[in-house]
Amino acid sequence: MDARSKWKATALLTWLLTTEIAHGLPHVGNKVEATLQRTATESASAFETQYPPSSSENRLLIPESHPVYRVGLQQDGHSSEQPFPQFDILQFVDGLEDLLDSDGDTATPAPTAPTQSTESTETDRSDHIQATSSAKHPENTVLIPTAASGTVSPQANPSTTKGQVDPVKTGPPPVASDKPKAMNGQDIFQPVATGPVPANIKSRDDHPVKNEHINGTDPIATNKFYAGLFLGSQTNATYTQPYSLAWSKGGGSLKSWGMIVSHVQSHMLAYGPPDNKIPGNPVKYYINPVALEHLILSATELGQSSIMSVEQPKAFSANAVIKSSAGSAQQITFPVVQGMGYVTAVYNDMEPLIESGIFFRKVVSAGSPRPGIFKYQVFLDDDTTWLLYATPAGGEDPKFKLVSKTHLGGPKGFSGTIQVAKNPAGKSGEKFYDNSSGVYPVAGEISGSLTGDVGTYTLSWTKSGKDIKGTPLIMFALPHHVHSFDSATEGRITDIHLRTTTKGNSTAVIGESWTLVEKNLPIDIGFAPWSTTDGSVHELSAAAQHAIIQAAPHELKQNISEQTDLNSMYYSGKALSKFATLVYTVNQLGNNVELATDAFQTLKKSFNLFVQNKQQFPLAYDSTWKGVVSTAGYNGDLNQDFGNTAYNDHHFHYGYFIQAAAIIGSLDPSWLAANKEWVNMLVRDSGNSVANDPHFPFSRSFDWYNGHSWAKGLFESFDGKDQESTSEDTMFAYAIKMWGKTIGDASMEARGNVMLGILGRSLHNYFLMEDDNANQPANFIANKVTGILFENKVDHTTYFGANLEYIQGIHMLPLMPHSPFTRRKEFVRQEWQAMFAESASTPASKVEGGWKGVLYANLALIDPKAAWEFFAQPNFDYSWIDGGATRTWYLAFVAGESFGWSIMSLRELINILGLGGSP
C-alpha cells in the first residue's frame, strides 16, 4: 500500500472512531469506539484457535476444489449472421456517377495512418468548418485540410468567444428537437408512460422459457446479474462483484447443497494463446475459474429434497432462498446485492454448516466486535484470510467447531445471520469489517438529475440486520465509480481492495449511499454531425453539400419497403434507422427537402407497418416475464432474430426504431400523435425509468451499477451475462436522448445524456483499452477492444466470426453523432495504428464488404481528410457500405468531423492530389 493510501485509511479509521455525526453515515458513537479499542487490547487468551483434526491421512490430502475453466463460447441465443442486413446495393446504382465529376477513372491515394499530430485538433478550437452562402447550386468544390484559417464553425449555440463571427445561414434551420434545452435539476427517472401496451400487441402466457423458480408477479429484469439463480439448472454463478455465488445443488467436490462463495485472484486466471497478428501479441482471451469452493454457507438439513427459489428480484438485488424441502419453514435466505461487502446468509431454525473445498488451515474465535456478534478468522490453504461474523437472533455464543479440514459446524436450531468476507488488508481491513458487521444491504435504488451539462446520480441501499441505525454499510465500488465520486463519497473510501472478475479492482466504501458526478455531458449532440471541439455542425460547406446531393439519389432509389420489412426486428430497425438518417441528411444537411420527400413518405409508411404490428413476425406482450418480444422465437427456435424472444439484445433492436422515430418526429411533428405510444412502449421494455411500472421492469438492459448494458437475456450461461457491441449500447442511450428531445420528455432526454456520460467512462475503463488501461490484464490490453465481455471472462472474438474487422468493428457501428464522445480520439488512434494502418496486419484498404465503410467512417474521428478521400473517391464501390448505413450519411459525418477545412476548387484539388487534368 502506498503512503497516501495508508494515510487515507488511517484518517478514515480515526474519523470512524471520533466523529459524532458523519456526513453520509449513521451515528456510530462511542459503542464502536469502545468495541474497536476492546478488540485491540483483548488478551490473547480471549481468542481460541482451532485446527483440523490431525492424522497421517489428512496430511496427504490436497484441496478438493479444483479450478474449472470453461473456455467454450456458448452460442445459445446468438446468430452467426453478420450484424447488418445483406442487400445487393449495386442494383440501385446507375453508372456509379463520380461525386467529384472528374473525367476518367482516377484512383484516390490510400489514406495514410493518422499520426499524433491529429490530436492537436482536440484542443485547438480555432480550426473550424467553412460556412458558405452557396447552398442551392454549389460549384465543383471539395473540402481539403489546411492550417488554421480563422473561419467560423456553425454552432448549435452561439459561442461566447470574442472575435467570432456568426456563420452565414443556409437552407432550412435545424429541426427544433436538435437544439439543446437548458435543464436545472431535471429528474432523470420520471415515468415514460403508465398505461398498458397498445391493444394490437396481443398478450401471450406461453413463453418458451418458463418461470419456475421466481416467487412473485412483478415484472422481471431478465438481463440482470442474478439470472443464474433461476435459469436452467440454477447452478451457474451470480457475480455480485467482487464475490461470486453459486448453488452447489449436491455437486462439486463436497456434494454440498449450500451456497458457494468464491473470489478469484489474478494468479488463477487462464489465458488463451497469443495473437501474433497484433502488435504486442496479446492473449486472445482470459477466463476466471469456476467451481472454486472457498466457502459454502450450508446447513445439515439441506439435501436431495432441497429447493431454491428467488424472491423480490429488482434492479440491484434479489433474494435467493434455499429450503430444506418444499413448504418447509427451515430455510436460508441470501440477500444478493451488487457490490455487497459481505455475503450474508439469514438462517431460520437450521444447523449451520460452513464448508470449504480449499480446506480450512485454522479457524480463530476472535471475540465480539459488538455485543451479540461473534467473530471468527478463517485461514484457508490457499493462503487467503476470510472473516466470519455470526449474529444469533437470541444473542448466545454459537460456538462454531472445526470438525475437519472441510467442515465448520454450528449449533442446532440456529436463527440469525452468518456473514463472510475476504480480507486482503490485514488489521486495518479487519477493523472496517468489524465496524460494519451485523448489517447488510437488501435492496438498492438509484436517483439522478441533470443541471446544465453536469449529471449527478446516487446509488443507495436499504439495509437490515442488528443495530441498523448505528452501523454503517460497507459496499464495493468499481473503478468507474471511484473515478466519479463526489468529495463526500471519496472521503469514505477504505484501503480494502478486491479484484473483480472482469473489471479490475473493487474498492470498499463506507456508507449507505454514493453520489457520483458526470461532467461535460454532450447535451448539445443532436442529429447533425458532432465533434468534441465544435459541437453540433448543422451547416456543412457547399462542397460537402454538393457531395451529399450527388450521392443521395442513388441511395434514395433503394426499396425502402422491402429493406425494412424483414423477418428480424434487429435488421428491420437498422434499415429504418438508415433511411431516417438518410432523409435527415438530405433534408437538413444537404438543404434539399424536395429530394427526400418521396423517400420520407415511404419511410413513414414502412414504420407504420410495425406500429400496426403487421410485420413478418409481429410483437407480442409476454405476460410471463413481462415485456414485448418478437414472436419469431415461439416456433421452437429461440435463436431466431438473435434471441429477441428470450430478451436478447432488446436495447440494440429497439434502439434503432427509437432513433428512427426521433428523426421522423422531428421532421414531421404531426406524426407523433399516432406513433408516440408505440415508440414509448419500446423504451419502457428495453430501458424503463421507474421500478413501479406493472407492465415492464426497471432498466432491463442498462446496468446502473456496472455502467453499461448486458445483452444476454433468458439463456443459461456459466460465464454470466455478456455484451458484444459497446457502440450499439451507446446508440440506445443516444436514441432515448433524441426521442426524449423530440417528444418533449425532458426526463428521458436527460437520462440519455447521463447514460452517455456513464458509458463514456465505463467503456474507457473496461472495453475500449488504451495502452495505459489499468483494469484489464496487461497481456490482453493490446487487443484494444475486449471483444465479448462476460461477467466471468473476456474473449477477443465475436459470435459471428473472428476476423479482426468484425471484432473491432462491432464496437464501432453504427457511426452516429455521439460516436466521437464515446470513442475517444487517443483510443481510436491507437487502435487504427495497431490494426488497420497500411503497415498493420489487417489494412483497412484491403478489408472487403461493408466492414470497409465502417472502418473508414470510424477513421473520421481522428483523420477526416483520409476518410473524406475514401468516401468521395471516384467510382466508389457501394459494396463497401453495409446494409445498415449509407454513403450519404458517411459523407456528412466525415465533413462534420472536418473542422479547420477550407474550400478549394475541384480543379485545384485534382492538381494537388496528382489526379491529372489541365490547370
Residue map of PLM features:
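Short sequence/structural elements of tandem HEAT/ARM alpha-solenoid repeats
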Residues: 597-601, 673-681, 750
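Ser/Thr/Asn(+Pro)-rich, low-complexity disordered segments
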Residues: 2, 6, 15, 20-651, ...
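"A position-specific structural signal for the A-helix of alpha-solenoid helical repeats
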Residues: 735-738
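Aromatic-rich carbohydrate-recognition surfaces in CAZymes
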Residues: 566-587, 644-671, 675-679, 725-733
